[in-house]
Amino acid sequence: MFFLFHRDDKVKPLSSKVRSLVKDVLKDCSLKKEEKGKLRFFNVIGHDLFHTGGTNSPWGGMIGIPYMFEDVKEINFGKLRLEGHDTIDWVVEGQELIEALTLSDNAKKFGLMREIYSCNIWDIMDNAFISTGCFLFPGAFVMKLNKNHTIEKLPLKSRTAFYILCYAFGYVLYRCLKDPSKHLCAKKYDKKAAVTGPDYLAGGIEFYQKILQRNKILRELLGTRGERMYDKDGNENYFLLAPMLPIRKRLELLQDLEKDLKAVPA
């Protein structure tokens, strides 16, 4: 789910600053001209980038850009609100958050480039195939047992528990396949965006450092809810399996890439 940014009941258009960033990133990316033409950019509510669709699909892709990609001088921090805070003193308790939310142009370009490459319809199709297979398998297994009259003599409660167990197995299998697949995709697109050039690599490192810094500050400002959302390192908290690659891992990937490139003789 995403939310378009509206102002005066109209969709807020991209500012000249953001349009300039998008133009530079599209110029640097390796997509074909027709693929670039399938991308649409819009303002999105929140502080995270968003993407959907694919440049390799007939419908194209969409990328949502948060307000923090605007020129910091144009942002009215007085109108920003945190959940559980009617107001926030941006000069005192919010100063560190402002610093964490403020990105250089290189960091913004890395984020945009990563989202552009992430607009791949095959990732969506892979997820659809995985989910279909993981839930069809237990369904077919249960149908076969019913057809062979294997479990029909069991009490209703026992049969119900067995059905639930079968589909729970399918869900666990789905997560065990889907999550690592998403992690691999995240690594691939992070690296692809970073190798665009030295500025993108440096921007990527800053991008993830700032996200970790932001999450740690939000953990403190949001109190108990913040502790449930983020750990002490700034990674998002998940129960058991992690659907997203931890931010710390993504940062370390780029830092290792930077070390490898520096080790290569000029």
Which functions belong to the PLM regions below?
Residues V44-W59, A194-A266:
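Active-site-proximal gating segments in proteases and membrane effectors
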Residues I63-I65, F69, F110-N120, F129, ...:
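Long, contiguous hydrophobic alpha-helical segments, chiefly transmembrane helices and signal peptides
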